[in-house]
């Protein structure tokens, strides 16, 4: 049992995170130099995301009997994303108004370092609904894969899958080649994931070494408030959705525990995307559903980011004594319903969307972003973890709604049961 524990990715990543925290705390300069380890691991994951999405979506769509099912799956997924992300925004808005973590800080926006957020503000100006929609269409297929733009690759994969399906038996050879290529890609993923402990160690050592645990104290109330809100959202909101769907949120979290630890170490939910595609299929969700819901969710179903955006915006208002009446907060909510859909599941994207939102609302000082610039990195873990769990739950829910969920398989896997009813440890 001890040997299997030490060999498990779960144990290795958890140990690596702990060592990274200790190194960053006691030897901050050395810890800060570990950044390339974390960056290298994330780059390796990003290298493989585009081909994984392409293969999964193409084989999933081309293998379906009816194309109407694909459209129905997409429509149901977008409806679910909109409802749940709106709930996340509202919950963040309610809790930050009740707790008021920024009240009493009395910060003068004129004294803040506006230059510190100038880069984010400049990037935020490029955000917009039209620009976002136009960006979904790649300039070239090669460009989409080269840049690793998830939505661009997804669009091409959907079109390719439709075209391959229309070829019928003539396209069988291409289908077989892509399916075989998919197996090779997942083999590469398994090799890359062996480096997850090193990546998690480097990323955590850098974070603690550069920013220090002490930097958490001054704005700790906002951080604690945000983490508690994310936990409540997962347990109460997603837990209720899971229960109605027919599974336990706690058993589901246990099932994806390794992916959660990888995300905890890297602060990017995107780092677990390839494994989530594989694990959700093993959980009983049809490949075509997994291939559509998971990648799309990384732009349209970021529950943790939604909570963060409302809480951070109102926190800045409270800290700078910028009064926000009910009209201003409703305006903020409406703007966030649109701008939050442009956030990708990568580290730092939430901060850029926040800058875009504050600029769009106009009532809040953009310089106020400097207040949370230093602690944004510490809140990204909770954002990424919540995003990952949210997209996993969404996949199961959508699969059930479109009748593409194997309920028996779902129950067997989450309860560590073999198909014959015997209980045993199912590898994750």
Curated annotation (Swiss-Prot):
Organism this protein belongs to: Salmonella typhimurium (strain LT2 / SGSC1412 / ATCC 700720)
Pfam families xref list: SDF
Gene Ontology BP term (one): L-aspartate transmembrane transport
Designated name of the protein: Aerobic C4-dicarboxylate transport protein
Entry keyword Metal-binding: no
Superkingdom classification of source: Bacteria
Family, as annotated: Belongs to the dicarboxylate/amino acid:cation symporter (DAACS) (TC 2.A.23) family.
Subcellular location: Cell inner membrane
InterPro entries per the UniProt record, alphabetical: C4_dicarb_transport, Na-dicarboxylate_symporter, Na-dicarboxylate_symporter_CS, Na:dicarbo_symporter_sf
């Amino acid at each position: 049992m001890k040997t299997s524990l030490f060999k498990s990715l779960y144990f290795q990543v958890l140990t690596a995170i702990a060592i990274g925290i200790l190194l960053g705390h006691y030897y901050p300069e050395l810890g800060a130099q570990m950044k390339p380890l974390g960056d290298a691991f994330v780059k390796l994951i990003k290298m493989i995301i585009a081909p994984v999405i392409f293969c999964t979506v193409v084989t999933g769509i081309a293998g379906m009997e009816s194309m109407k099912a694909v459209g129905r799956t997409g429509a149901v997924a977008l409806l679910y994303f909109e409802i749940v992300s709106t709930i996340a925004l509202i919950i963040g808005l309610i809790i930050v108004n009740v707790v008021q973590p920024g009240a009493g800080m009395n910060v003068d926006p004129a004294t803040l370092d506006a230059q510190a957020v100038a880069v984010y503000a400049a990037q935020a100006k490029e955000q917009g609904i039209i620009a976002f929609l136009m960006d979904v269409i790649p300039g070239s297929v090669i460009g989409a894969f080269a840049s690793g733009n998830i939505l661009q690759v997804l669009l091409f994969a959907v079109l390719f899958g439709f075209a391959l399906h229309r070829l019928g038996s003539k396209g069988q050879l291409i289908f077989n080649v892509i399916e075989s290529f998919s197996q090779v890609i997942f083999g590469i993923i398994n090799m890359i994931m062996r480096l997850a402990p090193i990546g998690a160690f480097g990323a955590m050592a850098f974070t603690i070494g550069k920013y220090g645990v002490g930097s958490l104290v001054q704005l700790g109330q906002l951080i604690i408030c945000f983490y508690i809100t994310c936990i409540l959202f997962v347990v109460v909101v997603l837990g209720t959705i899971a229960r109605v769907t027919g599974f336990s949120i706690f058993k589901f979290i246990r099932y994806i525990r390794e992916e959660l630890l990888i995300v905890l170490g890297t602060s990017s939910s995107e780092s677990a995307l390839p494994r989530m595609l594989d694990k959700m299929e093993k959980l009983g969700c049809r490949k075509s559903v997994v291939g559509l819901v998971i990648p799309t969710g990384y732009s349209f179903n970021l529950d943790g980011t939604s909570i963060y955006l409302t809480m951070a915006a109102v926190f800045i208002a409270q800290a700078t004594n910028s009064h926000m009446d009910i009209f201003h907060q409703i305006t903020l909510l409406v703007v966030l319903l649109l701008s939050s859909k442009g956030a990708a599941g990568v580290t730092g994207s939430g901060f850029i969307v926040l800058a875009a939102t504050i600029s769009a609302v106009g009532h809040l000082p953009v310089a106020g972003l400097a207040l949370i610039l230093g602690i944004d990195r510490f809140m990204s873990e909770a954002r990424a973890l919540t995003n990952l769990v949210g997209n996993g739950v969404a996949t199961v829910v959508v699969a059930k709604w479109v009748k593409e969920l194997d309920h028996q398989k779902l129950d067997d896997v989450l309860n560590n049961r073999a198909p014959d009813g015997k209980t045993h440890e199912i590898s994750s």
